[in-house]
Amino acid sequence: MSVQRNANKIKCMEIIKNLEKRGIAGYYCENAREASEKVLALIPDDARVAWGGSATLDEIEVKDKLQVLNAKIIDPSAYSDPEEVRQARTNALTSDVFLTGTNAITLKGELVNIDGTGNRVAALCFGPDKVIVVAGVNKIVKDEAAAIARIKTDACVANAIRLERKTPCALTGQCADCLIPGQTICSMTVVTRFCNKPNRIHVILVNESLGF
């Protein structure tokens, strides 16, 4: 193991300890393959599984493997009709398991997310019986202020481009705190600092750079 990877692992293990203090289960994986396997291990057979938009989940290729669990999939991206998309997002809030990434995680174990529609952070806060969060080491930051700065500088710009949004940041690469109906992806900010239902949230830290 390289010096940098070892340093990343030490940091992850400390964060996992801090997650446990917050009622959140934490796990460490060396790479995307291990992370994908861990996600599958945390999902019961025949579960109703949903997810929020996440480049990290795409990169670990876990969604395509859910068929081995006979999972019942709720996928809003499978629909083009706005009403069907809205209904799928609503149904996701009553799923057995919700999969998501996170925009940032602090050294103290706080999850920080900025959302456009709000369905992703809604499920993180309330609804699904179990939430599984996957995060690469590139998402680790010192504190909440650093998390917001990282998200505004890196994640939101990349996601605006990925989602083909007509926002200033998609054109210039810099956040302009825009207020554009149907386009702005920085609509709400949620900090998850504690889980009142112990181990409802499971965070998998991966010793690779994943997502934005």
Language-model segment annotations:
Residues S2, I24-G26, V137:
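Short, flexible active-site loop motifs that bind/organize anionic cofactors or intermediates
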Residues M1-N8:
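Glycine- and acidic-residue-enriched helix-capping/strand-helix junction motifs
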